[in-house]
Amino acid sequence: GTCPGCDLMEMWALHVDWANPGNSNLTALPGIQLTDWDQTLCGSGSDWSCMSQPGTSQKLDPIREPLHYPLQYRNFGTHETLVGCFAEDVDGLDRAAVHWFELRDTGAGWSLFQEGVYAPDEYNRWMGSIAMDDSGNIALGYSVASSALYPSIRYTGRLAADPPGLMPQGEASLIEGSGSQLTTSSRWGDYSMMAVDPLDGCTFWYTQEYANSQGNWQTRI
């Protein structure tokens, strides 16, 4: 987050020889440069909780450093894809946004096909999960909260023909939270999951956390 030009995806290729495990190998691939991002949400140190909630000084942990859920893979024959996302500080003031990306391999190795940062307003968005269906359409789900918005579940998306780097299909609410998390742990999510139904290849399923009026976390599919 403090080294311009240093933000990249590191990738490895794993070859497994089940008949002769000694022939298996793990090979580092060339790094893939992404647009520079600031991952220093909540500063440094042991307390990384800074996602505000209404009516309490207790804040939520944005899980700032890892990818939010494993990358999801598809093989379209002409190309392979990997989609993923993580949280970043979008304004330098600890406002969390979802940084998403799509990698492609058309036969010459993996490269960045598109990326974007979803931050349409002043709310924090984090703990995302992203998936692509059989037609190349993408759905992105995430947590959303602020000092004026209880922790809730929302989603957005893009069609395969939409302009690259954008989520222009608008934001929708799956469920609005009715309280703030008041338990002793500030951990939140760990993690959410967006998946495509294998029966039809186009129905997205999403599971995520939100807070109820009793100050307890709940999950919803």
Give names to the regions the model predicted:
Residues G1-I221:
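C-terminal PAP-associated
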